[in-house]
Amino acid sequence: MEKSKGRKSVSQATVENCMENPGLELMEGGNLEQRYTQEEVTQGHSLEDGLGHSSLWSRRIFQPFTKARSFFERHAGLFRKILLGLLCLAYAAYFLAACILNFQRALALFVITCLVIFILACHFLKKFFPKEQLRCLKPLENTHLNLWAKRVFVGLSVVGLILWLALDTAQRPEQLISFAGICMFILILFACSKHHSAVCWRTVFWGLGLQFIFGILVIRTEPGFNAFQWLGDQIQIFLAYTVEGSSFVFGDTLVQNVFAFQSLPIIIFFGCVMSILYYLGLVQWVIQKVAWFLQITMGTTAAETLAVAGNIFVGMTEAPLLIRPYLADMTISEIHAVMTGGFATIAGTVLGAFISFGIDASSLISASVMAAPCALALSKLVYPEVEESKFKSKEGLKLPRGEERNILEAASNGATDAISLVANVAANLIAFLAVLAFINATLSWLGEMVDIHGLSFQVICSYVLRPMVFMMGVQWADCPLVAEIVGVKFFINEFVAYQQLSQYKNKRLSGVEEWINGEKQWISVKAEIITTFSLCGFANLSSIGITLGGLTSMIPQRKSDLCKIVVRALFTGACVSFISACMAGILYVPRGAETDCVSFLNTNFTNRTYETYVCCRELFQSTSLNGTNMPSFSGPWQDNVSSLRNLASCCDLYTSTVCA
């Protein structure tokens, strides 16, 4: 150490005196480097010996853990099955306990469990019996049914339909008007067909038949009606959770009183949920099954059927994305079917907004599902296939999966994507309502010039569309109001139309008088259902630009074909909704037990309701004035001691000639 210090001091002195000696410095540097290298080697040997001993001890300590990990890796499949079996047993115990304690309370759990079991069963059948399943999935045109058997089937179907109509309409002959309406729309569309001789009537009749059968299951049968009523109630309960998020952001006052903060957030919530379901593959699975069923029955091609089936769940611009790789190679007839499906149905995201208006959820769901086969049928009636399609078999058609990497990203993207839809809806409502107000003001001004008072766009629609609405099955007294709504939907927007329908429904439920100063204030329940079906679609003039913009961005090379058929597809989609309304008019029957008005009026006079109005009207009709004497009553009110008191209470709420 002293020598080194000495050298260091000499060297430093040399540098300080500017008398450097390169040879001395080089020799000293070499000696230092050699010494330091020998020390590093010695220290390295000792470090390696230490690390060797520690590594040996660590291997001995962690050897049991390493063996355990390798054991679990070798038997990972077995442990996964054991864990899955334990979870299934635990869920089975929970499921049985819930059903035994209160089956009505566990009904939703029961339905979800049955759906999951059905999906798993289909998955295992496809996995273990692929050949047998593919044999069953062949379209019906490939089966060996001879012409005689087909004719017998068609004949039996026609005879069955005639017998059903004869027996069913014997009690309600007004339903024949709706049947005549279906025939009228089909004849009009056939007259407008592009190729009359190329119409495949099998596709047309199968589509209408499937729509009719589904309507019977949903509207007429008690289990089907209760199932869809229950489904609609569950969707309403589910959508009500939107209030929690919107109230936190906007506050309770805005959410309860302002439309934009009450209904539009539902679109964001529903878009988030749909994105999650799409990420999980449930939406694609349902679309493929619906498309397969429509294809084997109606004989349509795979690409157009997938798009139309997808329109049940997604909108007119999202459904073509499902078949985007195949759009360029599709025939004009197939593209026409895709367009018609978009115009004839509504998106799942806006379904929640319509339900928030107070529109019957089960009717909206039924109309959306019933529109799919009818859209394919009428599309092939208006624009039959005359080209050779490349998609006669569904092999090779794959629905795209979401690009999200996890479920949280899917939820976030779904909510974010819905913002543009919310902005679009809000902007359209502002613009179209303002335009409608301007049109009404202009028409009113023009009418005043020739002493025509109260002229408006709605009044014109009520006269022009009244015969068509009557052919759907609407009572003549309700036709003016329904015709107004249908005209607003086609020329303005379906949101405005559904909002107007909800106003009429709210008036009826709140017990407003049906006629005030000669003007009808609301429509009947049957008219509400028929109107709900007739409005269930995007077939309005503003949708032409949306459809052309979406499809042109995907297949710009076929812009001329798109522009050539878009108007034809628009009117076809509108007729799909009208025929669905006719189906509802044929199948509608009043439901629910009739109100015992005598007991009802004896116990319920707290506020105005629809039942209060009906019972008071019945009491007014049963009352006879006898000059200055006490009024007399007939029917169930004749021997009722409280009839006079109930009459006085009804006169406090409503006006009638017997109240004078």
Curated annotation (Swiss-Prot):
Major place of residence: membrane
InterPro entries: C_nuclsd_transpt, C_nuclsd_transpt_met_bac, CNT_C_dom, CNT_N_dom, Gate_dom
GO biological process: purine nucleoside transmembrane transport
GO cellular component: apicolateral plasma membrane; brush border membrane; plasma membrane
Reaction catalyzed: adenosine(out) + Na(+)(out) = adenosine(in) + Na(+)(in); inosine(out) + Na(+)(out) = inosine(in) + Na(+)(in); guanosine(out) + Na(+)(out) = guanosine(in) + Na(+)(in); uridine(out) + Na(+)(out) = uridine(in) + Na(+)(in)
An example molecular function term from Gene Ontology annotations: purine nucleoside transmembrane transporter activity
Subcellular location: Membrane; Apicolateral cell membrane
Domain of life: Eukaryota
UniProtKB keywords: Cell membrane, Membrane, Phosphoprotein, Transmembrane, Transmembrane helix, Transport
Bilayer topology term: Multi-pass membrane protein
Modified residues (Phosphoserine): 46
Residue intervals passing through the bilayer: 82-102, 106-125, 150-168, 174-194, 202-222, 235-255, 262-282, 297-316, 338-357, 364-383, 425-445, 456-476, 531-551, 569-589
Annotated family: Belongs to the concentrative nucleoside transporter (CNT) (TC 2.A.41) family.
Primary role: Sodium-dependent and purine-selective transporter. Exhibits the transport characteristics of the nucleoside transport system cif or N1 subtype (N1/cif) (selective for purine nucleosides and uridine). Plays a critical role in specific uptake and salvage of purine nucleosides in kidney and other tissues. May contribute to regulate the transport of organic compounds in testes across the blood-testis-barrier.
Protein name per its UniProtKB record: Sodium/nucleoside cotransporter 2
Record organism: Mus musculus (Mouse)
